[in-house]
Swiss-Prot record:
This is Glycine--tRNA ligase beta subunit. Belongs to the class-II aminoacyl-tRNA synthetase family. It is found in: Cytoplasm. It comes from Salmonella choleraesuis (strain SC-B67). It holds the Pfam family tRNA_synt_2f. It catalyses: tRNA(Gly) + glycine + ATP = glycyl-tRNA(Gly) + AMP + diphosphate. PROSITE patterns: AA_TRNA_LIGASE_II_GLYAB (PS50861). GO terms for cellular component: cytosol. PANTHER family: GLYCINE--TRNA LIGASE, CHLOROPLASTIC_MITOCHONDRIAL 2 (PTHR30075:SF2), GLYCYL-TRNA SYNTHETASE (PTHR30075). GO terms for molecular function: arginine-tRNA ligase activity; ATP binding; glycine-tRNA ligase activity. InterPro entries: DALR_anticod-bd, Gly-tRNA-synth_bsu, Gly-tRNA-synth_heterodimer. Its EC number is 6.1.1.14.
């Protein structure tokens, strides 16, 4: 069977830059699935993406499906014919579905009986016939939240489509996709190269686009070029470019032919906090800021043009003129805001709604102030500083700078607090209250900041759950999942002595009578324990290990972490598998027991040597392990409990649990319950697979 290179390119208007990669990757994944489902042999599927195109190139694509033998078994002979030997309706219906008559069917005989059988040799369809529908289906499944319609057509896509190129080797596959007839015409760069040209063979892509169209279609190559050129440009001015991955991706999705240039701004703007300047450069203009080796912002920025200019100074000058008013605004806001103390903004918080049922930002501030102070007392932080940080926590939201540059919330609070002469840990807490903002983000750096960050997140969790608006599906408008995970990370990684039960109860108490959900405390704790499951799975822990610990519903996050590490280590022990199985057996036995058990094991009722020995071990371990459990030394406890393997095995091998004598039976069940209770002090290891 011959194989050829296949190319599909969809030429469009400018695609959404933040979605470009996901569109291309989804297109490739969808089309690969279509090929596999159709049984079309193929090699590597490579995707390409630029602002005005999505493309796939498939190596070694078979020109047709393989032929295949089809067998369809019909009704049993007894049901296929009546007493007179005439075909039944069931047999005729089956035959019609196969495109034959009953008398054309074969018969299949086995040890179990005889059936009608249809056999056929089905010739594989050509790739040329199959591909158009595959491409259309793959495009229809792209993750596009909002579709566009253009012109008089009723075709919908993420952006208007101008060209569709479908080539199998050197042949155009005729098709109409997204309202466009397929061809071998490709459009180049808007302002450089050839505006349109033809491609003779799929193997020429993407090199022909580079040479004739001045477009780097390879997304990763384009991104790598921007990164390398920006690093070199920064090095030339003695600095380091801030090449954050998200901005690098976005810029790579905005240009087809990247040209990296360096510009500057007036040094006087460096008096403004760097975060505000960086927000303007990165957020609004898509520029890369430059820092010196000490991490101080330089009065330069690097940007990427989408054209090779004969006079680059014109482009540089234009970008400098664009950014200057934005930096001047930041300077004005900074100077204006500092004429007031942060505390002076408190009354205005009363005019901003946090949530309709939960009150204003001033109401939230009062709750955070109280909760941060309470948490500080629990974790040994400065209570006065924590309450002060809580009072000022939302004041910067009322400043001109944060109103204009929203991503500077928190960090501007820190700068203004320092200007006002607030304690340094209070100022830092105002910035770090929102941390961690995302997976892997830094945690608050000092105890006051930890108290404020936890208070802010717990207030939101308690309030939103308290009015029954918990996350549903993918919808999480108040970012409760992130808030819950943030609280857990801070408590676990900072090893704070906080209990989710009392923490949630305190957060709920501060709402007074505003909450309507009577089960809010349990709902919040269950939700947070659910975040543990996702977090620890990402950390590489097995699902059954997590379930074994969650079964105990430990509400102290640091304690949960200690149990997880203990069970994970326990699984490496030679005795673990046998003891997990024994615990499962004990759990099942106790679940079926209907008689009330004794409070203690009565030594006088023990008869068999194996049960006497097990009881002796349990008494010794119970006394020995109490300090271990009290101190959270769960790993050491499980190592000690591993010594029970031999007496437990001996017990089950030689002792009849459900003895006929009631007192003996109940005593043995009580013995097993005491065994299980010891393990349950750490986790339910019966859940380990």
């Amino acid at each position: 069977m011959s194989e050829k290179t296949f190319l599909v390119e969809i030429g469009t208007e400018e695609l959404p830059p933040k979605a470009l990669r996901s569109l291309a990757e989804s297109f490739a994944a969808n089309f690969t699935a279509e090929l596999d489902n159709a049984g079309l042999a193929h090699g590597n599927v490579e995707w390409f993406a630029a602002p005005r195109r999505l493309a796939l190139k498939v190596a070694n694509l078979a020109e047709s499906q393989p032929d295949r033998e089809v067998e369809k078994r019909g009704p049993a002979i007894a049901q296929a014919f009546d007493a007179e030997g005439k075909p039944s309706k069931a047999a005729e219906g089956w035959a019609r579905g196969c495109g034959i008559t009953v008398d054309q069917a074969e018969r299949l005989k086995t040890d179990k009986g005889e059936w009608l059988l249809y056999r056929a040799h089905v010739k594989g369809e050509s790739t040329e016939a199959l591909v158009p529908n595959m491409v259309a289906t793959s495009l229809a499944k792209l993750p596009i939240p909002k579709l566009m319609r253009w012109g008089a057509s009723d075709v919908h896509f993420v952006r208007p489509v101008h060209t569709v190129t479908l080539l199998l080797g050197d042949k155009v596959i005729p098709a109409t996709i997204l309202g466009i007839q397929s061809d071998r015409v490709i459009r180049g760069h808007r302002f450089m190269g050839e505006p349109e040209f033809t491609i003779d063979n799929a193997d020429q892509y993407p090199q022909i686009l580079l040479e004739h169209g001045k477009v780097i279609a390879d997304y990763e190559a384009r991104k790598a070029k921007i990164k390398a050129d920006a690093e070199e440009a920064a090095r030339k001015i003695g600095g380091n470019a801030d090449l954050s991955e998200s901005l690098l991706e976005e810029v790579a999705s905005l240009v087809e032919w990247p040209v990296v240039l360096t510009a500057k701004f007036e040094e006087k703007f460096l008096a403004v906090p760097a975060e505000a300047l960086v927000y303007t450069m990165k957020g609004d203009q898509k520029y890369f800021p430059v820092y010196d080796n000490a991490g101080k912002l330089l009065p330069n920025f690097i940007f990427v043009a989408n054209i090779e200019s004969k006079d680059p100074t014109q482009i540089i000058s234009g970008n400098e003129k664009v950014v200057r008013p934005r930096l001047a605004d930041a300077e004005f806001f900074f100077n204006t805001d500092r004429k007031k103390r942060l505390e002076d903004h408190l009354p205005r918080l009363q005019t901003v709604l946090f949530q309709q049922q939960l009150g204003t930002l001033r109401d939230k501030t009062d709750r955070i102030q109280a909760l941060a102070g309470w948490i500080a007392g629990q974790i040994g932080a400065d209570v006065n500083h924590a309450t002060r940080a809580g009072l000022l926590s939302k004041c910067d939201l009322m400043t001109n700078m944060v109103f204009e540059f929203t991503d500077t919330q928190g960090v501007m609070g820190m700068h203004y607090a320092r200007h006002d002469g607030e304690a340094e840990d209070v100022a830092v807490a105002l910035n770090e209250q929102y941390q961690p903002r995302f997976a892997g983000d830094d945690l608050p750096s000092n105890p006051v900041a930890c108290a404020l960050a936890i208070a802010d997140k717990m207030d939101t969790l308690a309030g939103i759950f308290g009015i029954g608006q918990h996350p549903k599906g993918d919808k999480d408008p108040f970012a409760l999942r992130r808030a819950a995970l943030g609280v857990l990370r801070i408590i676990v990684e900072k090893n704070l002595a906080l209990d989710l039960q009392t923490l949630t109860e305190e957060a709920v108490r501060l709402y007074g009578d505003k909450l309507t959900n009577a089960n809010v405390v349990d709902d919040v704790i269950d939700f947070m324990l659910g975040r543990f499951r996702a977090w620890y799975q990402d950390e590489g822990y097995t699902v059954d290990t997590i379930q074994a610990v969650l079964a105990r519903r430990p509400t102290r996050p640091a304690d949960f972490d200690a149990r997880m590490k203990a069970v994970s280590h326990f699984r490496t022990l030679e005795e673990a598998s046998a003891l997990a199985a024994a615990n499962k057996r004990v759990s099942n036995i106790l679940a079926k027991a209907t008689e009330p058990l004794n409070d203690i094991v009565h030594a006088s009722v023990l008869k068999e040597a194996a049960e006497i020995e097990l009881a002796r071990h349990l008494v010794v371990l119970r006394d020995k392990l109490q300090p271990y459990f009290a101190d959270g030394r769960y790993q050491e406890a499980l190592i000690e409990l591993a010594a029970l393997r031999a007496p437990v095995d001996e017990f089950f091998e030689n002792v009849m649990v459900n003895a006929k004598e009631k007192d003996i039976r109940i005593n043995r069940l009580t013995l097993l319950s005491k065994l299980r209770e010891l393990f349950l002090q750490v986790a339910d290891i019966s859940l380990l697979q």
